[in-house]
UniProtKB/Swiss-Prot annotation:
This is Probable disulfide formation protein C 2. The chain crosses the membrane at residues 6-25, 40-59, 66-83, 110-134. It comes from the Bacteria. The keyword rRNA processing does not apply.
Length: 140
């Protein structure tokens, strides 16, 4: 636990970078076409690589303030996509053009899908940013 408290931003950056690379591997190497909601989740995750990387490099204690909105938006989108994969009738018109957002290309152990991986990544980043915020408030 002390490692997490000491390196929370570095761990969050590693998660964001891994998620970015994995999404690129899925789409470019494995040729899995991303749906609209996957693109929106990428738009939330990719800036986190830069924000957390720069914040870590500059030792900016406010980095959680900058990164938190991106992580929350990505988490909400991933929850919505998990929901429409479980209940396809609840799909909005946003996914009506191109690849269906209810399509489940990856299904490990019967429940781990690409949006579930995204959800776990965003949730872990939010928890690590919260740890940073607590640490920041204690130092005041």
């Amino acid at each position: 636990m002390t490692i997490i408290r000491k390196y929370h931003i570095a761990i969050a950056w590693t998660i964001a970078t891994s998620a970015m690379l994995i999404s690129l591997i899925f789409s470019e190497w494995m040729k899995l076409p991303p749906c609209d909601l996957c693109w929106y989740q990428r738009m939330a995750m990719y800036p986190l690589v830069l924000i957390l990387g720069i914040g870590m490099y500059r030792k900016d204690s406010n980095v959680s303030i900058y990164a938190f909105p991106f992580a929350c938006i990505g988490l909400i989108i991933s929850v919505y996509q998990i929901t429409i994969q479980a209940f396809p009738t609840s799909e909005m018109k946003i996914c009506s053009v191109g690849v269906s957002c209810t399509e489940n290309y990856l299904n490990l152990f019967g429940f781990i899908s690409i949006p579930m991986l995204s959800f776990v990544g965003f949730l872990a980043i939010i928890i690590l940013l919260y740890i940073n915020q607590i640490k920041r408030q204690k130092n005041k």
